[in-house]
Amino acid sequence: MSIFIFPVETARPLLVLAAAALIIFPILYFLYLTVYRLFLSPISQFPGPKLAAWTYWYEFWYDVVAEPEYTFKIGRLHKQYGPIVRINPDEIHIADPDFYNTIYAGSGRKRDKWDWITRSFGVDESLIGTLGHDEHRIRRAALSPYFSKQSVRALQPLVDRNMGILLGRFREFAQSGAPLKLDDAYAALTNDIVEDYAFGKSENRLQAADFDPSFRDAMLQGGKAGHVLKHFPWLMDMLRKLPNSMLLKLSPAMGAYSQLQTNVKKQVADITQAHQMHAYDKTRRTIFHEILNSKLSDYDKSTDRLWQEGEVVVAAGTITTAWALGVSTYFVLATPEILSRLKDELEAAIPDPSQPLSLLVLERLPFLTGVVQEGVRLSHAISHRLHRICPDETLVYRADDREWRIPPGTPLSMTSNLVHHDERVFPDSHTFKPERWVNDPLLDRYLVAFGKGGRACLGINLAYAELYLTLAALFRVYGTEEVQGKDDIGTLKLFETTAADLVITSDTVVPVMPEDSKGLRVTVHQ
């Protein structure tokens, strides 16, 4: 056997060539990427900053370095470039309320999701993480019956029972004189309701002394971390391999989010085990017990996938509805004219406040509906833009006497914040005006907090039921020093809280109060 050894004079040129290749190839790739993105890309002709078209680092700066505020930067870009803007190398953003239903079309037109965004949540197999249109439709069909209007109306006793607990806590705070943190209380209310419906039991956060905001806070922390994970998806796999104790030290946001996921996994695993052993209450209709009885594939019913669905159902059913309740409550308490008109309508519709409320009756009350809709509009539900991809359809957008043809496969997005503050649709858009919905019922088409089309929020009916029932139960028996009803049991007073506490100042996917805010607080008097 012989051993071949390159002479030094032969090896040196090879090493030089290898070193040159290591330098030249990245430069060539960089030049190619620059030329392609700026001049050859199918969306190169769309308006927008060249830096955003050239590199994702532009978005990274506004997502991570300059706080999560790319949502607001996009709004400024539209003022500069017009209603259609290229906001990164691959994505087009549109700010035109009349085009919303085209992008977010019904299930008859294919709409996929973009993995560059969905991967940041770590729930790739959930409904919100499912990329393909057809697979999403199958998975959604298994869940839809449990969120229909009929199913939600059957849940009213669950909502009423939890609202009764919350009103009992109001009496406790009236006796102690301590400020009540309504944002925490509402998050506890919505969380107890959705967990009970999803898993058959809740964490009873309403009965915790501080309303146990841990779940809500963990989701908000996860939203903050999501911006980093969007740009560096490999971090998710790496962080998941770390124990929670270490993760909490390295990244409190990801640690809290990981612990939340662990808790949901246990809930789903317990349900799966009970189902396999037939050791559960068959008289109670809960979401995940029913899914296990559905015709979904074995994988779609596996614990590995269902915990992701569980996290999304509980998170979406907790945060967005609670925030809409908080926004509505603040503006009703802060505006005597609105409170007076609302209480007059509620007293006429509910002569005896001790009797159970009727959701059907409440849904027909025009001013209460206006209060609910304004709360939803100004809470926005999702602060981040929503993405869709039309895989086999060229969308045509017309603006300023120009026609823009958007190629199939292009990620498209719109943002509810921009739609809800479009002054052409909602004049004086930053003012809480329930009467705008009374005077123009056609405005409903522009209320996009829960999305539209085949991928709209699955829990919209449950959210509205909670909004109607909670606001009606609260303001039927509580007023303020200025506005009181004949059957009131007490008054509420805003405590060191202003409209500035409700302004969304950063994009953490879901709305969040400013960091220096002490929360939506009231004092209760009886």
UniProtKB/Swiss-Prot annotation:
Pfam families (alphabetical): p450
Gene Ontology terms: cellular component: membrane
Role: Cytochrome P450 monooxygenase; part of the gene cluster that mediates the biosynthesis of the mycotoxin fusaproliferin (FUP) that belongs to the class of bicyclic sesterterpenoids. The FUP biosynthetic pathway starts with the enzyme encoded by FUP1 that combines a C-terminal prenyltransferase domain responsible for the synthesis of geranylgeranyl diphosphate with the N-terminal terpene cyclase domain, to yield preterpestacin I.
Binding-site positions, heme: 457
PANTHER family, per database record: CYTOCHROME P450, N-ACETYLTRYPTOPHAN 6-HYDROXYLASE IVOC-RELATED
Cofactor: heme
Superkingdom to which the source organism belongs: Eukaryota
Gene: FUP3
Alphabetical list of InterPro entries matching this protein: Cyt_P450 (IPR001128), Cyt_P450_CS (IPR017972), Cyt_P450_E_grp-I (IPR002401), Cyt_P450_sf (IPR036396), Cytochrome_P450_monoxygenase (IPR050121)
GO molecular function: heme binding; iron ion binding; monooxygenase activity; oxidoreductase activity, acting on paired donors, with incorporation or reduction of molecular oxygen
Biotech applications: Fusaproliferin shows cytotoxicity against pancreatic cancer cell lines and provides a new chemical scaffold that can be further developed to obtain more potent synthetic agents against pancreatic cancer. Fusaproliferin and its analogs show also anti-inflammatory activity and can be hit compounds for the treatment of inflammation-associated diseases.
Membrane-protein topology: Multi-pass membrane protein
Segments crossing the lipid bilayer: 13-33, 312-332
Family from the record: Belongs to the cytochrome P450 family.
CDD domains for this protein: CYP58-like (cd11062)
Organism encoding this protein: Fusarium proliferatum (strain ET1) (Orchid endophyte fungus)
Pathway linked to the protein: Secondary metabolite biosynthesis; terpenoid biosynthesis
Protein localization: Membrane
UniProtKB keywords: Heme, Iron, Membrane, Metal-binding, Monooxygenase, Oxidoreductase, Transmembrane, Transmembrane helix
Name of the protein: Cytochrome P450 monooxygenase FUP3
